[in-house]
Every structure is written in C-alpha cells, then in structure tokens.
A protein has these predicted regions:
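Short, charged helix-capping/linker segments at alpha-helix termini
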Residues: 5-14, 24-43, 57, 163-164
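Amphipathic alpha-helical segment used for protein-protein interaction
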Residues: 6-9, 82, 94-124, 128-138, ...
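Short amphipathic helical patch at the helix-1/turn junction of helix-turn-helix
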Residues: 16-17, 28, 125-127, 132, ...
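Amphipathic, Lys/Arg- and hydrophobic-enriched alpha-helical face
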Residues: 16-34, 51, 67, 111
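Structural recognition of an alpha-helix C-terminal capping motif at a helix-to-coil junction
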Residues: 25, 39-46, 60-72
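Hydrophobic positions on the alpha-helical face of helix-turn-helix-like DNA-binding modules
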Residues: 44, 69, 122, 135-136, ...
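Arg/Lys-rich amphipathic alpha helix in sigma70-family domain 2
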Residues: 50-57, 67-88, 100
Length: 164
C-alpha cells in the first residue's frame, strides 16, 4: 500500500491481484450471491483507491483495513437492497458449488444460518486468518469482543453441524 501511496503505477494492480481471491471469497460468503458479491468487491476496491492516502501502518494492518472496507461495502449493499433468503436450495447454487463435497456444502449452509455478525467474524478469523487484533480492527470492535464473537461462531457452527 505504501507503494500505491507513493504513486507507483503498477502497485495498485499488484495489490489488487494479491488480495482479489480472499476478498472476493469473503464478500461472496457474506452476500450469498455472485452479482451482489461482484458489486461489493468493486465497491471495496473503488473505496480503497479513493481512500489510499488515508491508510497508515500506525492505524493497523492493511489487510484488516481492507476487510473493514469490504465488510462496510457488504453492509451498505444489504441495507440498499432487499435480501434473498440466506439458505439456498440446491437449484439456486451456482454450478461449481454443486460439485463441492457434501461436507463443504454442509459448512456453507451452516455458515448461512449464523447471524451476520458471527458469520463475518468466522469468515475473517477462521477462514481468512486474521488474528484477534486484526479481526478487532476489521470489525471495529475490541479484541476481547472479537475473540468472543469468533468463539460463539465456532460454537454455533458445531451445533448446526451436529457436533457437541
């Protein structure tokens, strides 16, 4: 990000490529539909580009800042649009998803049943590897609250998946 701020012409493209897959995965799991995910993904990188001079290392990691912008884009999108049901039928799943192993489909369905604030914490912490302090920065909550949300999300997922 510092290269982007310094005006390096290829730096934003490199930054985009580095974070594209995990960020798109996050917004897709939060929105549960490709069109909404693409909108949120584009909004995120547009916001990053517009706010590129406001990020500083002192404020936290770039990754937590990026995911915070993405989470805000998802929240804004959800407020603006009417929501589809979170649990999709087999026919509504995109074709590649239909080929997933049954365990993966079960996890995706269980994630869809979590309250949005717990799903967001689980996706960022457990699936995208943000540590508790990064998770707290990304969600704009305290580290203790981040740890608690992640724990509650894991507990609820275990219950939804039939574990103890």
């Amino acid at each position: 990000m510092e290269q982007v701020q310094a005006g390096n012409p290829g730096a934003f493209t490199a930054l985009f490529e580095r974070h594209r897959a995990p960020l798109y995965g996050f917004v897709l799991r939060m929105t549960r539909e490709e069109a909404s995910a693409e909108d949120c993904f584009q909004d995120t990188f547009l916001s990053v580009h517009r706010a590129r001079q406001t990020w500083s290392r002192a404020a936290g990691t770039f990754r937590s800042w990026l995911f915070r912008i993405a989470a805000n884009a998802v929240h804004d999108h959800q407020r603006r649009s009417s929501r589809r049901p979170l649990v999709l039928t087999e026919e509504e799943l995109p074709l590649p998803v239909r080929d997933w192993p049954e365990e993966r489909l079960m996890l995706e369905r269980a994630l869809a049943q979590l309250p949005p604030h717990l799903r967001e914490a689980f996706l960022l912490g457990a699936m995208h590897g943000l540590d508790h302090s990064e998770l707290a920065e990304a969600l704009d909550i305290s580290p203790d609250n981040a740890r608690a949300r992640l724990s509650r999300a894991r507990t609820q997922l275990r219950q939804l998946l039939g574990g103890s």
